Swiss-Prot record:
Coiled coil: none
A Pfam family recorded for this sequence: Pkinase
The species this protein was found in: Drosophila melanogaster (Fruit fly)
Protein name: Putative mitogen-activated protein kinase kinase kinase 7-like
Cofactors named for this entry: Mg(2+)
One MF term in the entry's GO annotations: protein kinase activity
Record-listed E.C. numbers: 2.7.11.25
Chain ranges of the Protein kinase domain: 11-266
Family: Belongs to the protein kinase superfamily. STE Ser/Thr protein kinase family. MAP kinase kinase kinase subfamily.
Catalytic activity: L-seryl-[protein] + ATP = O-phospho-L-seryl-[protein] + ADP + H(+); L-threonyl-[protein] + ATP = O-phospho-L-threonyl-[protein] + ADP + H(+)
Length: 393
């Protein structure tokens, strides 16, 4: 249950923070603490129901990526929902505000991962909750824009209600929601996919339409299964993330992944520094294929396969130790360059030398260096380019 507090202890300010489903949100002070307060005006029965639903759901939720409720108050005419105050604003404001801060793919994946964790949690409750309004406006940032929390549960519902009413923000709604079919967790997955596309394009969904502000045009595009333009996605977005977007936005709900699957995939992408498999032609007869894997023990490894026309292929495998990832990348460059000079014999020797270097690295501790993990990919690309100039089999 949400704690009932005395309204006299709540000092509302004039600062307007935004408007959620069913009420305005203002800044306030409660027990010498800055908070956000959602104000519900019960002139309409629908608003009253939304308020009770939001308060009920938030009272059952305890997750680091969901806004925390402090209590509720009433003055007889209106109800007030007291929540933690996150002063850095919404993800929408970050994307489209006046400051226009730049952000990396890694940061976008971090935001998406945190949202996925929260949704996976909501969908896995004993009474699973569907948020029904996933969008950047409902993602609040904190910790110098590094982290986010989902807010505004006014439209949320537990899946046992079998809701068929059209609720949410049109640009982010699933086709089945528009067609008044049953709301399921896969509706949140679709909205998540739309938001992920938005993170990787910094464009409003359906802004490519001839009449992008027409509700009818947007509704028609969604219900017909029209895809958002993938060519608008930033060039450094990993292919795996693009494929995830398309899976989430599949017109068939059954083909969309679960939020738990999405959380797992994004977690692997983020921990690996969004390393991408790639292919590098070295000459007319030789191609280098660099791939990243997780072995049976959960450790990350990098494989470099040299495929040669009418000759046996050669494989080099490198464990990736987090703390020493940067040094490993340099070792890969050095040892592969040696291999390029002498052929197969040196390739095998290089592999042994690199394994020795990695073994030493493993003894130096497990301190996390995410940036170093990215350097492995960059150094590997450089190594392959050097081999393109020097390799002779």
């Amino acid at each position: 249950m949400v704690k009932q507090v005395d309204f006299a202890e709540v000092k509302l300010s004039e600062k307007f923070l935004g408007a959620g489903s069913g009420g305005a949100v203002r800044k306030a002070t409660f027990q010498n603490q800055e908070i956000a307060v959602k104000i519900f005006d019960f002139l309409e029965e629908t608003i009253k129901k939304n308020a009770e639903r939001e308060i009920t759901h938030l009272s059952e939720i305890d997750h680091e990526n969901v806004i925390r409720v402090i209590g509720r108050a009433s003055n007889g005419k209106k109800d007030y929902l007291l929540m933690e105050y996150l002063e850095e604003g919404s993800l929408h404001n970050y994307l489209y505000g006046d400051d226009k801060w730049e952000y990396t793919v890694e940061q976008a994946v971090r935001w998406a991962l945190q949202c996925a964790k929260a949704l996976a949690y909501l969908h896995s409750l004993d009474r699973p909750i569907v948020h029904r309004d996933i969008k950047p406006q409902n993602m609040l940032l904190y910790n110098q824009h590094e982290d986010l929390k989902i807010c505004d549960f006014g439209l949320a519902t537990d899946m046992s209600n079998n809701k068929t009413d059209m609720q949410g923000t049109l640009r982010y709604m699933a086709p089945e929601a528009i067609k008044h079919l049953k709301y399921t967790a896969k509706c949140d997955v679709y909205s998540f996919g739309i938001m992920l596309w938005e993170l990787m394009t910094r464009q409003l969904p359906y802004s490519h339409l001839e009449n992008p502000n027409s509700q009818y045009a947007i509704m028609k595009a969604i219900s017909s299964g029209e895809k958002l333009p993938m060519e608008a996605v930033r060039s450094d977005c990993p292919e795996g993330i693009k494929q995830l977007m398309e899976c989430c936005m599949d017109i068939n709900p059954e083909k969309r992944p679960s939020m738990k699957e999405i959380e797992k995939f994004l977690g692997e992408q983020y921990e690996s520094g969004t390393d991408e498999d790639f292919i590098k032609p070295l000459d007319e007869d030789t191609v280098a294929v660099v791939t990243y894997h997780v072995d049976s023990s959960g450790s990350r490894i990098m494989r470099v396969d040299f495929w040669r026309h009418q000759l046996p292929s050669i494989r080099m495998t490198f464990p990736i130790v987090k703390r020493e990832a940067e040094r490993l990348g340099k070792t890969v460059v050095r040892e592969m360059a040696k291999a390029a000079a002498d052929g197969d014999r040196e390739v095998r020797r290089a592999e042994k030398d690199t394994e020795r270097e990695t073994s030493r690295a493993a003894h130096n501790g497990e301190r996390e260096t995410r940036r170093a993990g990215q350097d492995v990919g960059r150094e590997t690309v450089r190594a392959v380019k050097k081999i393109g100039k020097k390799l002779r089999f």
